[in-house]
Amino acid sequence: MATTVVLCSGGLDSSVIAKWAVEELGGRVICLFVDYGQRNAPFERRAAERIAEAVGAEFETVGTFWLRRLCPDNPMFAGRLPREAGTEDLSANWLPARNWNLLGVAAALCDHLYLEGEDDEFHIVWGINAEEAERFPDNTKEFADAVAEALKRGLPSRPRLHSPLAELYKPGIVRLGSELGAPMELSVSCYNPIWEDDTPVHCGECEACYHRKRAFERAGIEDPTEYLE
């Protein structure tokens, strides 16, 4: 039986790739949440856990905090993420080597399970997409292809890297999620979320909420998200 590790941040894309992994790859699926000290980690972790439960996957969480120690003033840690839509830029969202860090943790889990003799076929699924690839170099297909080759060459578990959203923009991701029956309503995109009755509530005003609203609108899919504004 194959084992698949899904990098699950608790966001919209994560809810779609988690469902995709269960439907397309089958076998044992583990949703892996990495807490690297991001300011919304408690909200994101809860969302990731609920997504895993909804799709019938296992859930694992790992803490890795060297990024926060190296970059303490980064907006991801310092609480200065843009409040209003239209104020976002690369400096507000770029965390040095974050995707390397996340992929490394997923790869380490694959190797651990391989060395324990639990499986001999491994997959890693992550949610890079075409929209973010236009701004972030570690979200491009070229980067993913290079990492996929490195994983095969550098690890005894030889995990295969899957990027099912790499050629999709947000509306396409929403459509795919709808087709799969992904639990998008459980995901958290907001920079300033709150929880009410174990349900994520989005502020409706930040850049992330703007992109989320627009994605559902352009996809022609009813938005299940609860917004304050």
Curated annotation (Swiss-Prot):
Keywords, in A-Z order: ATP-binding, Ligase, Metal-binding, Nucleotide-binding, Zinc
Catalytic activity: 7-carboxy-7-deazaguanine + NH4(+) + ATP = 7-cyano-7-deazaguanine + ADP + phosphate + H2O + H(+)
One matching Pfam family: QueC
Stretches of the chain forming a coiled coil according to its record: none
Enzyme class, first EC level, given as a word: ligase
Enzyme Commission number(s): 6.3.4.20
Record: residues binding ATP: 8-18
Alphabetical list of Gene3D superfamilies matching this protein: HUPs
Residues that, per the record, bind Zn(2+): 190, 203, 206, 209
Free-text remark on how the cofactor is bound: Binds 1 zinc ion per subunit.
Cofactor(s) in the UniProt record: Zn(2+)
Pathway: Purine metabolism; 7-cyano-7-deazaguanine biosynthesis
InterPro entries documented for this protein: QueC, Rossmann-like_a/b/a_fold
GO MF annotation terms: ATP binding; ligase activity, forming carbon-nitrogen bonds; zinc ion binding
Function statement: Catalyzes the ATP-dependent conversion of 7-carboxy-7-deazaguanine (CDG) to 7-cyano-7-deazaguanine (preQ(0)).
Family: Belongs to the QueC family.
Database matches in PANTHER family: 7-CYANO-7-DEAZAGUANINE SYNTHASE
Protein name: 7-cyano-7-deazaguanine synthase
Organism: Methanopyrus kandleri (strain AV19 / DSM 6324 / JCM 9639 / NBRC 100938)
